Structures are given as structure tokens and as C-alpha cells.
Amino acid sequence: MFTINAEVRKEQGKGASRRLRAANKFPAIIYGGSEAPIAIELDHDQVMNMQAKAEFYSEVLTLVVDGKEVKVKAQAVQRHAYKPKLTHIDFVRA
């Protein structure tokens, strides 16, 4: 099983997302279930290594958001058009 460390995003919008990507992070969101959606930021290199395995897309993942574990599945993954970079991931609560 995969465990990914995440932080709640303090800023949102295009400029904030670009600053995240320049800092080797990228935005993501957790939604679904009865709880409200959570905008998070992830470390690019950590997730890039994990997503190379097929299990990343089919198994339940554990996101540690501010010390609290959230069980999720990767719903949608957006990649850069020509660079080997992730730009956004949607996670749905499992």
C-alpha cells in the first residue's frame, strides 16, 4: 500500500498553482463521501516514483493530511503535455 504525505493548500488559483509547481510540488484535491472537499499539495518526486507502478491507480492509497490519515483512490491524473511532470491529481475517498 502507498502512503503519501500531503499538506492543506493555503492559497488557491492559477498563480498559487504555478508557485507550487516551481517549488517541485503540485496541487491535488480530495472529494467524495460526506466530508467537504480538501485542496492539498503533494511533493512531485515522491508521487512521481509511486505512480510509475500500476498499483497506484487500482489500490486504495493512504494520504496523511496534517497528521490525519485519509483512504483514497486516484480518480484522475493530469500530466504536462511534453515534460515528465504531474500537474494535478483528483482523489476520491474510499
Swiss-Prot record:
Which Pfam family, any one, appears in the UniProt record? Ribosomal_L25p
Q: How does it assemble?
A: Part of the 50S ribosomal subunit; part of the 5S rRNA/L5/L18/L25 subcomplex. Contacts the 5S rRNA. Binds to the 5S rRNA independently of L5 and L18.
Species whose genome carries this gene: Salmonella typhimurium (strain LT2 / SGSC1412 / ATCC 700720)
Keyword Hydrolase annotated:
no
Q: Name one GO molecular function term.
A: 5S rRNA binding
Q: Which GO terms describe its biological process?
A: translation
The answer, when asked if DNA-binding is one of the entry's keywords, is no
**Disulphide bonds in the chain:** none
Name by which UniProt lists this protein: Large ribosomal subunit protein bL25
The entry's function note states: This is one of the proteins that binds to the 5S RNA in the ribosome where it forms part of the central protuberance.
Q: Which domain of life is it from?
A: Bacteria
Q: Which NCBIfam families match?
A: PRK05943.1 (NF004612)
Q: Which UniProt keywords apply?
A: Ribonucleoprotein, Ribosomal protein, RNA-binding, rRNA-binding
Q: Which residues form a coiled coil?
A: none
Q: Which family does it belong to?
A: Belongs to the bacterial ribosomal protein bL25 family.
Q: Name one GO cellular component term.
A: cytosolic large ribosomal subunit
